[in-house]
Regions:
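Conserved Rossmann-fold NAD(P)-dependent oxidoreductase catalytic core, especially the SDR/UDP-sugar
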Residues: 84-122
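N-terminal Rossmann-fold NAD(P) dinucleotide-binding loop
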Residues: 3-4
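Conserved Rossmann-fold cofactor-binding substructure of NAD(P)-dependent oxidoreductases
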Residues: 33-59
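NAD(P)-cofactor binding segment of oxidoreductase domains
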Residues: 57-98, 131
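A conserved pocket-lining segment of Rossmann-fold NAD(P)-dependent short-chain dehydrogenase/reductase
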Residues: 158-177
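Conserved beta-loop-beta element that borders a ligand/cofactor-binding pocket
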Residues: 102, 133-155
Length: 177
């Protein structure tokens, strides 16, 4: 819901895009759109054919759109998977890494938030993202950019599903979808 629309947007601006999908159907769908697609699974180590991995890492910039799960295999799995991807990119001398984080690193802060605003995550996934951001900022030999995304909605991400069965004590308080 994020990677494919981003890839298509970049391609419409003339960028060559190489990407990974976890299923062969996903790889074929990406290729049908003109994306140089390859299969890759995270367990949390990378499971990928060596030639495909070389193609995936032969890029000017690596964009990581792997979402931190609120439920699922767990925080350690996510942390290890992201670190495995980044370590592999560094071994392949990828010069630039763009990591999609979340405004959940700010916790329950309200008002206008800036990059320099204090991070105080209130969820396990927010804490893992904060730790990964810190780790990424300290990597030598590569340029790292971190985007803290919020409010991602679309055909497969309807806002109502995030609020179903929950009470909102303060209707004026910001929410992170």
């Amino acid at each position: 819901w994020l990677g494919m629309p981003l890839a298509l947007s970049l391609m419409s601006r003339g960028w060559q895009v190489t990407g990974s999908k976890t299923t062969q159907d996903g790889v074929e769908a990406a290729r049908m759109c003109g994306i140089d697609g390859y299969p890759l699974r995270l367990e949390p180590q990378l499971v990928c054919d060596a030639e495909d991995l070389d193609a995936l890492m032969n890029v000017d910039a690596l964009v990581i759109t792997l979402p931190a799960r609120r439920t699922g295999p767990g925080d350690d799995f996510y942390r290890q998977a992201v670190q495995e991807i980044v370590d592999t990119a560094l071994a392949h001398h990828v010069p630039r890494i763009l990591f999609t984080s979340s405004t959940s690193v700010y916790g329950n802060a309200s008002g206008t938030l800036k990059e320099s605003s204090p991070r105080n995550p209130q969820t396990a996934s927010g804490q893992v993202l904060k730790e990964l951001e810190d780790w990424l900022h300290n990597l030598p030999g590569t340029s790292v950019d971190i985007l803290r995304l919020a409010g991602l909605v679309g055909p497969s991400r309807h806002p109502g599903r995030f609020f179903a069965g929950k009470s909102a004590p303060d209707g004026q308080h910001g929410v992170n979808l």
